[in-house]
Amino acid sequence: NKYFGGEDEINKKRSEWAKKHLVVLAEGDKKKPTLTVIDRGEGQSPERIQNSIVHLSGSIKRNVDFVFGKYHQGGSAAIRFCGSKAKCYQLVLSRRAETIADKSKPNDYGWTLVRRNYKSRTAFYEYCTDRDGNTFSFKFEKPLKIDGIDIEFADGCLIRLYDYYLDNP
């Protein structure tokens, strides 16, 4: 290809891009590992997490073609394969990308723990907030080191799925 190189060159560029922007880690038990997915996309600020990443019934994703949640492939689709009825958890950690963050506010990390609750006839999802109903947050001082490996998380979104059921690992 005149502008992008041949197929090998295009695949090499895609691979290099993916290494920088998308990470999938598995640890623990082979049939029920803890999976960590890091997407170094735009991320969300703590005050936006409740209306975006963990929001199930809103229309925020309807007009955005590239988000998984629009196609029911986001976090709520994955959590049903986590753990057991007694413990079904997913960690959400996010920080807005510096290039699009609101410069008038601190650009902190936000986090919550999501669980699928089976205490009624119909299971439902719920997530943790502080006592005022806000998403938990902490100051950004430097990128977080992930599990002692050579990966740093500065912004984007990290989803950790605990005891994820893999039928055929």
Question: Model features per residue range: what roles?
Answer:
Residues 1-40:
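ATP-lid-like helix-loop hinge signature
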